[in-house]
């Protein structure tokens, strides 16, 4: 997120999958920004949705005219409009094209998309919780509504304990083409109140199974009498992309831990986390990360007991709660000229 003071050349928007060349442009913009800022401006799901025809999103693209009549992609926003109550956006602006109104224009368009359903709120992720992001949020009437923590542990210093599974529970690896429906049912129940994870569709799961990092051997299912009770899904980040590790070091991730509500209270979450940590340690990894909501104090306490410490924070901004002095103030007045002082961008 950064200040902008001059408008971009043009904005276009579309639904469905982006044309392959445009999707590649967005990925290139994302990687350029990662190298510049040290923080990924877009999370995994928006990147997967770039090429998903059924994704419930609006793509907003900011273009800058270059020599010969060609156009260069200098900004991108993705607005998740799959909910009737909250639209969620992630934004990125090219480092060399900031302070030109691009971010403000993208944010204004995102606000318009959210407002297509009366009363729907716009929430915007700002990855890294940088000081500039907080300043921009304050200038545009946004407040923090959620924090997502990245936590990390050195498993050579904090080796995982032996998993204490309930009697009769057996663990096996996920079988592609066989276990998707059962896993999705338990995942939806386990994350019924989670705004992103609980909505994972068959297409979302298939997209992850097609990713280079997917390894069914690291996707462990806990069953009793053939009934799925929970799972731990791990991931390995290559050294060129890994957060929190030494340069070039592969880093493991406890990607998803889910327990069916009927199996909660049996210590399944702790046991599954220990299984995931042991799997990643046995692969020769030293650093393991995970992401958890700051509001999930029980999980945070469990992870800290296992040696995890907070290493990064992503922040979601949204309108002030009802009853606060700023309640009712627009996030962005979409009639504002993009070149007005104080223009800003999220995720850049």
Curated annotation (Swiss-Prot):
Residues 320-348 are annotated as: Disordered. 1D-myo-inositol 2-(L-cysteinylamino)-2-deoxy-alpha-D-glucopyranoside binds at residues 44, 196, 235, 253, 291. Its EC number is 2.3.1.189. Residues 12-156, 169-330 form the N-acetyltransferase domain. It catalyses: 1D-myo-inositol 2-(L-cysteinylamino)-2-deoxy-alpha-D-glucopyranoside + acetyl-CoA = mycothiol + CoA + H(+). Acetyl-CoA 2 binds at residues 257-259, 264-270, 296-301. Acetyl-CoA 1 binds at residues 91-93. GO terms for biological process: mycothiol biosynthetic process. Monomer. Belongs to the acetyltransferase family. MshD subfamily. This is Mycothiol acetyltransferase. It comes from Cellulomonas flavigena (strain ATCC 482 / DSM 20109 / BCRC 11376 / JCM 18109 / NBRC 3775 / NCIMB 8073 / NRS 134). The lineage of its organism: Bacteria, Bacillati, Actinomycetota, Actinomycetes, Micrococcales.
């Amino acid at each position: 997120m950064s200040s902008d003071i001059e408008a971009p050349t043009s904005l276009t928007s579309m639904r469905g999958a982006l044309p392959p060349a445009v999707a590649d442009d967005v990925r290139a913009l994302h990687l350029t920004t990662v190298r510049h800022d040290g923080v990924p401006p877009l999370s995994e799901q928006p990147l997967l949705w770039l090429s998903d025809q059924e994704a419930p999103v609006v793509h907003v693209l900011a273009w800058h005219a270059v020599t010969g009549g060609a156009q260069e992609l200098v900004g991108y926003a993705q607005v998740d409009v799959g909910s009737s109550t909250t639209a969620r956006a992630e934004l990125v602006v090219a480092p060399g094209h900031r302070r030109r109104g691009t971010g403000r224009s993208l944010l204004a368009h995102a606000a318009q998309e959210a407002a297509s359903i009366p009363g729907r709120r716009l929430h915007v992720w700002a990855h890294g919780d940088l000081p500039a992001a907080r300043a921009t949020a304050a200038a545009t009437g946004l407040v923090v509504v959620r924090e997502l923590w990245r936590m990390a542990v050195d498993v050579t210093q904090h080796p995982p304990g032996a998993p204490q599974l309930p009697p009769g529970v057996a663990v096996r690896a996920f079988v592609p083409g066989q276990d998707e429906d059962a896993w999705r049912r338990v995942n939806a129940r386990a994350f019924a109140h989670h705004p992103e994870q609980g909505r994972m569709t068959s297409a979302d799961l298939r997209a992850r199974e097609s990713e280079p990092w997917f390894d069914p051997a690291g996707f462990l299912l806990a069953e009793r009498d053939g009934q799925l009770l929970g799972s731990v899904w791990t991931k390995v980040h290559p050294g060129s992309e890994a957060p929190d590790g030494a340069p070039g070091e592969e880093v493991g991730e406890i990607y998803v831990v889910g327990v069916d509500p009927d199996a909660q209270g049996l210590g399944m979450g702790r046991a599954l986390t220990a299984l995931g940590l042991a799997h990643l340690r046995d692969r020769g990894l030293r650093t393991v990360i995970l992401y958890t909501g700051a509001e999930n104090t029980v999980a945070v306490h469990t992870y800290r007991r296992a040696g995890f410490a907070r290493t990064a924070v992503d922040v979601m901004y949204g309108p002030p709660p009802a009853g606060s002095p700023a309640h009712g103030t627009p996030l962005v007045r979409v009639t504002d000229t993009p070149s007005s002082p104080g223009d800003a961008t999220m995720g850049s």
